[in-house]
């Protein structure tokens, strides 16, 4: 059984017309989206994905300071979500983080899907981000497991090295998952943005996968990533 998996930080100020067009045309089986803003009627991702036939789990993360909107993680599935849980991760006073877990029934086989968006550290080492990864690893299932999201960490970071010790990173070659035309962080080095990877799909050893694909959808400051898995 083959499944198309997509992970994308769609940016709370992204171009929703471009984002929704891509999501509609790509037709993934399971989708993890970061920076969903459910209380913004101009970009109602939840209603849009429901119309496409997805079940979903929503996990609020934090309040966007400039306008009071709620930024959330969201996981969507074309297959029945049998059980779900939102795991709280270590956080700061103003920046809450979590991981969504969904047990999904794919024609009689249960797969365990986790989606997260870790603390933004401007691509620098951070003990809170590292503790978030440690907490995530503790809750992971051992088999039939998919973990996806914006880890806000580069491949050489402690956080990603820890993930790779426990799961398979389907892409080991240097790639960028940031949109250099839109990614605008005054505290990040603009010279390395075109070669920076922050987004990942990890799998347990028992799941086969194709290569990582990076999508130039241009609606967000991150690029969508996908793979085709076989369970």
Question: Residues of each region from the PLM?
Answer:
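Acidic/histidine-rich helix-loop elements
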Residues: 4-13, 37-40, 65-66, 119-126, ...
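Glycine-rich, phosphate-binding/catalytic loops in enzymes
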Residues: 22-24, 47-51, 93, 131-132, ...
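Structured loop/turn residues at beta-strand edges in well-structured enzyme cores
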Residues: 1, 26, 79, 143, ...
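Active-site-proximal segments of metal-dependent phosphoesterases and phosphodiesterases across multiple
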Residues: 117-136, 155-167
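Active site of divalent-metal-dependent phosphoester/diester hydrolases
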Residues: 41-42, 55-77, 95-96, 153-219
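Active-site beta-strand/loop signature of hydrolases that rely on acidic residues for catalysis
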Residues: 5-9, 19-42, 76, 102, ...
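Acidic, histidine-bearing metal-coordination/catalytic regions of metal-dependent phosphoesterases
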Residues: 1-4, 61-63, 70, 228
């Amino acid at each position: 059984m083959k499944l198309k998996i997509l992970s994308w930080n769609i940016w709370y100020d992204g171009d929703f017309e471009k984002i929704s067009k891509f999501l509609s045309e790509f037709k993934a089986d399971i989708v993890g989206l970061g920076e969903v803003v459910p209380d913004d009627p101009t970009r109602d991702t939840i209603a849009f994905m429901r119309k496409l036939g997805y079940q979903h789990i929503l996990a609020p993360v934090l309040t966007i300071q400039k306008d009071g909107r709620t930024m959330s993680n969201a996981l969507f599935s074309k297959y029945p979500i049998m059980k779900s849980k939102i795991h709280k991760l270590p956080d700061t006073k103003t920046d809450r983080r979590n991981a969504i877990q969904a047990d999904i029934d794919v024609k009689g086989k249960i797969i365990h899907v986790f989606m997260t968006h870790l603390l933004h550290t401007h691509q620098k080492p951070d003990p809170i981000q590292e503790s978030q990864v440690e907490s995530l690893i503790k809750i992971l299932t051992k088999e039939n497991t998919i973990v996806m999201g914006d880890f806000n960490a580069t491949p050489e970071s402690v956080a990603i090295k820890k993930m790779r010790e426990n799961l398979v990173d389907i892409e080991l070659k240097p790639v960028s998952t940031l949109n250099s035309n839109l990614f605008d962080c005054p505290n990040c080095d603009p010279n390395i943005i075109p070669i920076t990877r922050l987004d990942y799909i990890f799998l347990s050893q028992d799941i086969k996968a194709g290569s990582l694909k990076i999508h130039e959808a241009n609606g967000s400051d991150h690029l969508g990533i996908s793979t085709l898995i076989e369970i």
